[in-house]
Amino acid sequence: DLFRNFLDGIGILEKEEAAPEWISEIKMFDDIEQETKISEWQNKVEKIQSDIKCSQNKLADNMRLKSILYTSGDRLVEVVFEILEELMGCDLSGFVDNKKEDFLFEIDDNVFIGEIKGVRHNVKNENISQLDVHFQGYLDEHEEKDPNSVKALLIMNHQNNKAPEEREPVKDTQINLAKRNGSLIIETAVLLKLLEEYRSGKKTREMIINMIANSKGLLKLE
């Protein structure tokens, strides 16, 4: 580049003369046709780029929802809240965590109270017993409530260090304990399937609410 600049400086290299601005105004040959094609292609490219961005955003949202298969703590709770709100039409924005239950909401005459857990082990008796403590505590504070209208839910992302198909099923001991307590275990993988069926129209919100309100033990999709 230095040598080329030197030759240019002493006038050995011939400079290409710049085209004047007015030359682009002269339309000849197939100029107009080609400019029209370029404009159409640019519009198509912009539309494709917009569609790609839209699909990327949807994939990112799907990935966020699927995160309940491996997360725990606040991150898990936040996404589960979003799913519960969409599935059941509840509003958890005003829920205050008093270090008791993880969620509490009412739909018509039914009260749903529950725990959300992300753990590496399978469901344990202590998880179900802790849920029952919250259930009984709520009844103690609301003596006017019919116990049959209060539903205790244990939303579990158990064995979250494994892919769902590699996880051991919830054992009968824990399922029977949940049945005895009148509570319901909902695995996060099942919660995602419910959301998928709701969005596809296979299940309505009313069907989902009734299924959750009237099931005991371990929630299974019909």
Where are these regions (language model features)?
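Catalytic core segments in nucleotide and nucleic-acid processing enzymes
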Residues: L59-E222
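Polar/charged alpha-helical tracts
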Residues: N5, S39, E206-N210
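Interdomain/boundary linker segments immediately adjacent to catalytic/signaling cores
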Residues: K15-L69
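A conserved amphipathic helix/loop scaffold
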Residues: D1-E14
